[in-house]
UniProtKB/Swiss-Prot annotation:
Upper lineage: Eukaryota, Viridiplantae, Chlorophyta, core chlorophytes, Chlorophyceae
PANTHER family in UniProt: PHOTOSYSTEM I REACTION CENTER SUBUNIT PSAK, CHLOROPLASTIC (PTHR34195:SF2), PHOTOSYSTEM I REACTION CENTER SUBUNIT V, CHLOROPLASTIC-RELATED (PTHR34195)
Record flagged with keyword Secreted: no
Coiled coil: none
Gene: PSAK
Protein name (Swiss-Prot/TrEMBL): Photosystem I reaction center subunit psaK, chloroplastic
Source organism (scientific name): Chlamydomonas reinhardtii (Chlamydomonas smithii)
């Protein structure tokens, strides 16, 4: 029984690994073709909605896909003369990002990017 008591334990605490600092840089992204595509697609969808070329909270579509003015069903108040709200900004920003991702992945798929 004495041998069991003096045997070193099988579980030894391990030292924590040293952490090294990691530097993340965006040098290759700012101004790259991917960045320009994302900026252009988001800007295009926001501009289309702001200037009445796409549906917004204030401009809904009919069954024939015509834009018609309607009352603000979202209940969001806007000081913008065209009635552009934060709901429109978020929706069109998401649509622009989706469009941009599709363009980038399509161009990468055919090897053009």
């Amino acid at each position: 029984m004495q041998a069991l008591a003096t045997r070193p334990s099988a579980i030894r605490p391990t030292k924590a690994a040293r952490r090294s600092s990691v530097v993340v840089r965006a040098d290759g992204f700012i101004g790259s073709s991917t960045n320009l595509i994302m900026v252009a697609s988001t800007t295009a969808t926001l501009a289309a909605a702001r200037f009445g070329l796409a549906p917004t909270v204030k401009k809904n579509t009919t069954a024939g896909l015509k834009l018609v003015d309607s009352k603000n069903s979202a209940g969001v108040i806007s000081n913008d003369p065209a009635g552009f709200t934060i709901v429109d900004v978020l929706a069109m920003g998401a649509a622009g990002h989706g469009l941009g991702v599709g363009i980038v992945l399509g161009l990468k798929g055919i090897g053009a990017l």
